[in-house]
């Protein structure tokens, strides 16, 4: 949906996303959706699926979109279903017990850097085996209580879909990810403004927003250069995984 702001001579168009507000009885679902623990917990994943199987499939198994688009009628049905509410409480209790386990202090902390992380289909920041392996490292660190902090990129454009041109040529179509519909949180300063990293580069400074992904007990921080403090040449650094020319690849690395 587009929202027109008409207080200027020329119309300004802004994106407007219509979402559902969760009742207080269902707020635990929101916390579960914002931590990828459910990805490798079968009861957590099946809980989201059973809230609305059709919407779960159409959302690409994205619990954030699922909860945003869950109808008020369906919410009422869930809250009236004692078995479902007990199930939500059970999964949430499992999650809290998992998160309460202390981190190991007998080993050094680990900083892990990767261009891609394969964690779930909803977060399109990986391409193949390397990303899946990196994602598995984080999950295993979480299960083992190993103190790890992971760093990567939040790519504006995720996977591409292919189509054919009129002359039979394959065309790669990239659709931008809507960060408001992803299981991520923007890192903010104490004053409430977005945190901005400054990265020195020959002749200029590149600026980066930071987004946090909760992966069980682990934190994955993703950098994003696609905002107006950067030039158009630097905004594309985090547009695509392994995308662009060699200079852009060097910038990413």
Question: Regions from the language model: what does each represent?
Answer:
Residues 1-253:
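Catalytic cores of carbohydrate-active enzymes across secretory and cytosolic contexts
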């Amino acid at each position: 949906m587009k929202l027109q702001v008409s207080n200027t001579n020329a119309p300004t168009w802004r994106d407007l996303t219509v979402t559902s507000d969760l009742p207080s009885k269902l707020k635990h679902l929101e916390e579960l959706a914002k931590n990828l623990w459910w990805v490798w917990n079968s009861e957590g994943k099946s809980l989201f699926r059973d809230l609305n199987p059709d919407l779960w499939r159409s959302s690409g198994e994205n619990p954030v979109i699922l909860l945003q688009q869950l109808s008020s009628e369906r919410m009422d049905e869930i809250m009236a279903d004692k078995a479902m509410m007990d199930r939500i409480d059970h999964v949430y209790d499992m999650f809290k017990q998992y998160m309460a386990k202390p981190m190991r202090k007998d080993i050094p902390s680990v900083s892990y850097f990767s261009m891609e992380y394969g964690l779930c289909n909803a977060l399109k920041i990986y391409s193949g085996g390397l990303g899946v392996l990196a994602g598995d490292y984080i999950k295993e660190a979480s299960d083992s209580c190993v103190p790890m902090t992971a760093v990567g990129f939040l790519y504006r454009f995720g996977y591409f879909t292919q189509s054919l041109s009129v002359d039979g040529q394959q065309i790669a179509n990239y659709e931008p990810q809507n960060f408001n519909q992803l299981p991520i949180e923007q890192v903010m300063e104490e004053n409430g403004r977005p945190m901005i990293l400054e990265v020195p580069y020959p002749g200029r400074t590149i600026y980066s927003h930071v987004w946090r992904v909760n992966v069980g007990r682990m934190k994955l921080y993703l950098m994003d250069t696609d905002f107006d403090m950067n030039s158009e040449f630097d905004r594309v650094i985090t547009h695509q995984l392994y995308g662009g020319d060699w200079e852009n690849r060097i910038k990413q690395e």
